[in-house]
A protein has these predicted regions:
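Structural/interface elements that position substrates and couple domains in central-metabolism enzymes
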Residues: 20-26
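NAD(P)-dependent Rossmann-like dehydrogenase/reductase catalytic/cofactor-binding core
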Residues: 2-14, 29-33, 37-122
Length: 122
Protein backbone atom coordinates (compact mmCIF):
# COMPACT_ATOMS: atom_id res chain seq x y z
CA UNK A 1 0.00 0.00 0.00
CA UNK A 2 2.97 2.35 0.35
CA UNK A 3 1.86 3.55 3.79
CA UNK A 4 4.08 4.46 6.72
CA UNK A 5 2.87 3.48 10.19
CA UNK A 6 3.30 5.84 13.13
CA UNK A 7 2.15 5.26 16.69
CA UNK A 8 0.69 7.57 19.30
CA UNK A 9 -0.74 7.24 22.76
CA UNK A 10 -4.49 7.79 23.06
CA UNK A 11 -4.79 11.58 23.37
CA UNK A 12 -7.24 14.04 21.84
CA UNK A 13 -6.05 14.83 18.33
CA UNK A 14 -3.30 12.21 18.42
CA UNK A 15 -0.30 13.63 16.49
CA UNK A 16 -1.24 15.30 13.23
CA UNK A 17 -4.48 17.02 14.25
CA UNK A 18 -3.00 18.18 17.54
CA UNK A 19 -0.22 20.02 15.66
CA UNK A 20 -1.96 20.94 12.39
CA UNK A 21 -5.29 22.30 13.63
CA UNK A 22 -3.81 24.88 16.04
CA UNK A 23 -1.66 26.13 13.14
CA UNK A 24 -4.75 26.55 10.97
CA UNK A 25 -6.63 28.14 13.88
CA UNK A 26 -3.76 30.57 14.47
CA UNK A 27 -3.88 31.54 10.79
CA UNK A 28 -7.55 32.42 11.31
CA UNK A 29 -6.60 34.51 14.36
CA UNK A 30 -3.93 36.30 12.29
CA UNK A 31 -6.55 37.14 9.66
CA UNK A 32 -9.18 38.00 12.30
CA UNK A 33 -6.89 40.47 14.08
CA UNK A 34 -5.61 42.04 10.86
CA UNK A 35 -2.03 40.78 10.95
CA UNK A 36 -2.11 40.14 7.19
CA UNK A 37 -4.45 39.25 4.36
CA UNK A 38 -5.25 35.61 3.66
CA UNK A 39 -3.11 35.52 0.52
CA UNK A 40 -0.04 36.80 2.36
CA UNK A 41 -0.60 34.38 5.25
CA UNK A 42 -0.83 31.46 2.82
CA UNK A 43 2.15 32.62 0.75
CA UNK A 44 4.27 33.30 3.83
CA UNK A 45 3.57 29.87 5.27
CA UNK A 46 4.23 28.10 1.97
CA UNK A 47 7.54 29.89 1.49
CA UNK A 48 8.57 29.93 5.15
CA UNK A 49 7.76 26.32 5.95
CA UNK A 50 8.11 24.72 2.52
CA UNK A 51 4.53 23.44 2.77
CA UNK A 52 2.77 22.76 -0.55
CA UNK A 53 -0.38 24.59 0.65
CA UNK A 54 -0.92 27.51 2.96
CA UNK A 55 -3.09 27.06 6.06
CA UNK A 56 -6.20 28.53 4.42
CA UNK A 57 -5.79 26.49 1.25
CA UNK A 58 -5.42 23.39 3.40
CA UNK A 59 -8.38 24.32 5.63
CA UNK A 60 -10.58 24.77 2.55
CA UNK A 61 -9.38 21.38 1.28
CA UNK A 62 -10.10 19.65 4.62
CA UNK A 63 -13.38 21.52 5.17
CA UNK A 64 -13.81 24.41 7.57
CA UNK A 65 -16.55 22.52 9.40
CA UNK A 66 -14.16 19.61 9.93
CA UNK A 67 -11.43 21.97 11.18
CA UNK A 68 -13.89 23.58 13.60
CA UNK A 69 -15.09 20.20 14.85
CA UNK A 70 -11.52 19.05 15.49
CA UNK A 71 -10.69 22.29 17.33
CA UNK A 72 -13.72 21.79 19.55
CA UNK A 73 -12.67 18.20 20.32
CA UNK A 74 -9.13 19.36 21.13
CA UNK A 75 -10.43 22.18 23.34
CA UNK A 76 -12.82 19.90 25.23
CA UNK A 77 -10.42 16.96 25.44
CA UNK A 78 -7.31 18.86 26.48
CA UNK A 79 -8.97 21.64 28.47
CA UNK A 80 -6.56 24.30 27.24
CA UNK A 81 -7.82 27.61 25.86
CA UNK A 82 -5.07 27.61 23.24
CA UNK A 83 -7.34 25.16 21.42
CA UNK A 84 -10.39 27.46 21.50
CA UNK A 85 -11.62 27.99 17.93
CA UNK A 86 -11.08 31.42 16.41
CA UNK A 87 -14.37 33.37 16.18
CA UNK A 88 -13.70 33.97 12.47
CA UNK A 89 -13.56 30.21 11.81
CA UNK A 90 -16.88 29.81 13.65
CA UNK A 91 -18.35 32.71 11.66
CA UNK A 92 -17.28 31.18 8.33
CA UNK A 93 -18.80 27.79 9.21
CA UNK A 94 -22.01 29.39 10.49
CA UNK A 95 -22.27 31.27 7.17
CA UNK A 96 -21.99 27.98 5.24
CA UNK A 97 -18.47 28.74 4.01
CA UNK A 98 -17.19 25.18 4.36
CA UNK A 99 -14.40 25.16 1.79
CA UNK A 100 -13.92 23.47 -1.55
CA UNK A 101 -16.84 21.06 -1.06
CA UNK A 102 -19.22 24.02 -0.88
CA UNK A 103 -17.43 26.16 -3.47
CA UNK A 104 -16.60 28.82 -0.89
CA UNK A 105 -14.57 28.84 2.29
CA UNK A 106 -11.74 31.23 2.89
CA UNK A 107 -11.48 31.37 -0.91
CA UNK A 108 -14.14 31.07 -3.61
CA UNK A 109 -13.88 28.13 -6.00
CA UNK A 110 -15.46 28.12 -9.42
CA UNK A 111 -16.46 24.94 -11.20
CA UNK A 112 -13.20 25.30 -13.15
CA UNK A 113 -10.59 23.85 -10.71
CA UNK A 114 -7.88 26.04 -12.25
CA UNK A 115 -9.69 29.18 -11.14
CA UNK A 116 -9.64 30.28 -7.51
CA UNK A 117 -10.79 33.74 -6.51
CA UNK A 118 -10.18 35.57 -3.29
CA UNK A 119 -13.37 36.33 -1.44
CA UNK A 120 -13.80 39.24 0.89
CA UNK A 121 -13.52 38.82 4.63
CA UNK A 122 -16.84 38.35 6.40
Amino acid sequence: LGKVVITSHDYSGFIVNRILMPMINEAFFALYTGVACKEDIDTGMKLGTNHPMGPFELADFIGLDVCLSIMRVLHAGLGDNKYAPCPLLVQYVDAGRLGRKRGIGVYEYSKDPRSTKSSSRL
